[in-house]
Amino acid sequence: MNLHITKSKNAESFYICKSYTKANGSTTSAIVRKLGTLEQLLPEHGPTRDDVLAWAKNEVKIETEKYKKEKEAQTVLIPFHADRQLDYNKQVFFRGGYLFLQSFYYQLQMNKTCRKLKQKYKFKYDINAILSDLIYAKILEPCSKRSSYKVASEFLEKPSYELHDVYRALDVLGTECDLIQAEVYKNSHFLGKRNDKILYYDCSNYYFEIEQEDGNKKYGKSKEHRPNPIIQMGLFMDGDGIPLAFSLFPRNANEQISLKPLEKKVLEDFGCQKFIYCSDAGLGSESIREYNHMGERAYIVTQSIKKLKKDEKEWALNPQGFKRVSDDAPVDITKISEDDKGLYYKDEPYTTKKLHQRLIITYSPKYALYQKSIRDKQIERAQKMLDSGNTKKNRKNPNDPARFIGTLAVTKEGEAADVKHYLDENKISEEGQYDGFYAVCTDLLDDEVDDILKVSEGRWQIEECFRIMKTDFSARPIYLQDENRIKAHFLICFLALTIYRFLEKKLGSKYTCEKLLDTLKGMNFAEIQEQGFTPLYKREAITDDLHDVCGFRTDYQFITKSKMRNIQKKSKGKE
């Protein structure tokens, strides 16, 4: 509603008008109520014109509130005809799950970051719409960039760009990858304080659907033993499981060299100066520990017991000297039952040439039983291989059951050797001695063991980050060739993961990844005779929670077009 004033030769008239959109998309207005002329209104609402104007504006406000209440309470009657066919090429299905992701996209002020890019490069296409749609599609329907454009065309808000603009935008996004990461981190504080006093780091590889290595895409060993060229991604994550920063490097390069350039970026561009670095043993070399011992930084890294010196290994595996983590009570771990749920530890100073450290050994009967059960199954498979004569020549995988098969060459003088295979009991016994044991090394000499172990246990979240990107967001295989566009691909995956993690955190981590993603994918709408929309999803506790954390609701039996536009505005932080 708005106040409309007309002036003629004889009078000044005041009207309350309502604007609306016609079927062809044009806007017009209609008079809702005539308030009267200035001459008529002055005696009751004067004595001045300003007094009349103030009264008239208040009447508009009252009329607007009245209209809204009537609109919300009204019953909508829309005629359908059983003998009328559907219109050609008329879209009636619309995806709406992106609205909840959009709420976090705009809270991260990524639209403002895109505005900076537009001012810098002077392009005409809408990079904010392109980036946001690519992120939403990555979460809701992971597919190629071309297919993502088709997915976006099913959103309630249509793409305001063409497909060729998407590929142009990828070049810019790849070039400005570091800037965007820094901006997202800075703006993420609008969503609450970041737990950036603990930073986890890990690497994972991604393969390409190409035959020849090129640039950063190098041949290398992957867990799946694929022959395709591979690139590695290094990822920093905060203590709440939310991504912080990433970098890319060739697979044939040592993953340890990936850390320092990215950590330097975190130190300088993000302003994170005081934190505990946490990683697995593969990314916890002596040089990495020294690097994270500088300034206000510290480290907690896993330590391979097998790689300890002889006397340190003997101390670690000795059952004496352990204490219960919960109360520090001394315990002889040889006397506790297999089904004991407790965790036990011992620690000692662990000094190298340059570092004064602390080595913490833990023992878990539950973990020991788990490791033994896994190995027993592998031994069974090894025995079956021996019985069938199907033994492997190459046993490079540390989890391959064939590692338990020994080879013995028996020969008589002057004759060729007979090769015999057998179950290697010594190998089995050697592995068994490590069951249940785990080691952590840190330069936090005075902190409580329980606190140190809790930080180390949080590493599962960064492993889950990679799993979500690879499995749920289909970050691999990669079909792009250009280096900048490859960077943009990973940037989109990174941003999708960041938004997903913030949403997950806001929901209190109540729901599994599968449940949350399935719910978002299912929150769709059907357009009814161009009058509005009806939800196509089932209302549940999770949909109520999504609406509560995002500050709008879509779970009405019918949503008028004007109300849906208001919902879209709210999802962008506009009232």
What is the predicted role of each segment?
Residues 36, 482-503:
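Basic, amphipathic alpha-helical segments enriched in Lys/Arg and hydrophobic/aromatic residues
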Residues 247-269:
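Active-site beta-loop-alpha junctions of metal-dependent nucleic acid enzymes
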Residues 496-497, 502-530:
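Conserved nucleotidyltransferase catalytic core and NTase-mimicking acidic/glycine-rich helix/loop elements
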Residues 23-24, 155-161, 192, 239-242, ...:
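Secondary-structure transition/capping motifs at alpha-helix termini
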Residues 1-212, 216, 227, 236-247, ...:
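Dynamic "connector" segments at or just before major functional cores
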Residues 254, 278-287, 305-308, 484-486:
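Acidic, metal-coordinating catalytic cores used for nucleic-acid/nucleotide bond scission
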Residues 231, 245-248, 296-455, 518-575:
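An anionic, glycine-rich sequence signature occurring as long contiguous blocks
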Residues 452-479:
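Short amphipathic alpha-helical "interface-anchor" segments enriched in bulky aromatics
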